[in-house]
Amino acid sequence: MKLSQLFWGELKNEAANTRRILAAVPLDKGDFKPHEKSFSLKRLAVHVAEINGWWKETLLQDELDFSKGDYKPVEINSTEDLLALHDRLVANAEKILSEVSEEEFAKPWSMRNGEQIYFTMPKGEVARTWCLNHLYHH
């Protein structure tokens, strides 16, 4: 079995569980923060949905450079918006995983901020750590 198939099987199962949790997020309490340094509930829900988009950055690019400052959090206004974001990004991850070569998982990928490199590791390790384990973390 290919690594991409293993990743997709795991993501598919986790995505179903994540979707159920996102559907239960009380967005009328979206401003709630358990601590002043915490994300708001709404921002955390969007973050969890957006993690499914990281497959694109991981497998179709060779680095993520924060100095480019091109990230803007998605604005959602309803549970339907949140679930649509989640579903769209999971479908895109499925497409990417169905098309990626096995060789791509061995290529190096870096997270950086301009000249400062936080880490470089094979894309397969990045996918496991940041696309799956980070999702479980939340």
Feature-to-residue mapping (PLM):
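Helix-adjacent hinge/juxtasegments
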Residues: 57, 62-101
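Acidic catalytic patch
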Residues: 99-115
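Short, contiguous alpha-helical
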Residues: 8-23, 27-72, 111-138
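Basic/polar N-terminal segments that are highly enriched at the extreme N-terminus
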Residues: 1-8
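Short, conserved clusters of charged catalytic residues that mark active-site
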Residues: 2, 77, 88, 126, ...
